[in-house]
Design a protein with these regions (language model features):
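A short, internal acetyl-CoA/4′-phosphopantetheine-binding micro-motif in the GNAT/acyltransferase core
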Residues: 82-89, 115-117
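Conserved GNAT-fold acetyl-CoA-binding loop/helix
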Residues: 17-46
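Conserved GNAT acetyl-CoA-binding A-motif
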Residues: 98, 104-117
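A short beta-loop-alpha structural element at the N-terminal edge
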Residues: 4-18
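Conserved acetyl-CoA-binding loop-helix of GNAT-fold acetyltransferases
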Residues: 84, 90-103, 124, 128
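A short helix-loop-beta-strand connector motif used in the catalytic cores of GNAT acetyltransferases and
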Residues: 44-57, 78
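Conserved beta-strand in the GNAT
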Residues: 57, 63-71, 78-83
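Conserved catalytic-core motifs of GNAT/GCN5-like acyltransferases
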Residues: 112-116, 123, 127-147
Length: 160
């Protein structure tokens, strides 16, 4: 399975949102099926952030199967909305997207992201590529967000 990572275009947004909704719907089951923000995000929401956010997509056989976003704030790149179509999860697509977003921000001294405390697959993936937990915040109903970071100089070296 050859995966091609490229910069997204505005025309890709409907496919990106569809995959994001299906991926995060599965994620929401870990938290009792409660809706989580990525599930109600719209094409217009993503388009509004377009000028300040890099969106990358992963394609297999010309079909979008995943995406990730990165936004530089000072010397920190905030990584978010890593989404892989359920049929393509567990095949390295998420890892490739994460490494590609890091590579796209060589000026970043730090990468930061968050995920839910019950999202073991996410936590394992991020840990495997060098992210470490630095904070947990409660968001209600026993759910915690786990904030993770990675040194930008390490990111450049690991994606080489």
């Amino acid at each position: 399975m050859a995966v091609v990572i490229r910069r997204a275009s505005l025309e890709d947004l409907p496919a990106i949102i569809k995959i994001q909704h299906s991926a995060f719907e599965i994620e929401s089951r870990l938290y009792g099926g409660r809706p989580i923000p990525p599930m109600w995000e719209t094409v217009d929401d993503v388009a509004a952030d377009w000028p300040s956010t890099l969106v990358l997509v992963a394609e297999v056989d010309g079909q979008i199967v995943g995406s990730v976003r990165g936004r530089l704030d000072g010397d920190t790149c905030h990584v978010g909305r890593l989404s892989v179509h359920p049929e393509h999860q567990g095949r390295g697509v998420g890892t490739q997207l994460m490494l590609a977003v890091e590579e796209a921000f060589p000026q970043a001294r730090r990468f930061e992201l968050f995920t839910g405390h019950l999202s073991e697959r996410n936590l394992r993936l991020y840990g495997r590529i060098g992210y470490v937990e630095f904070r947990r915040e409660p968001v209600g109903d026993g759910v915690w967000l786990v904030y993770m970071q990675k040194d930008g100089t390490t990111a450049s070296a690991s994606s080489a």
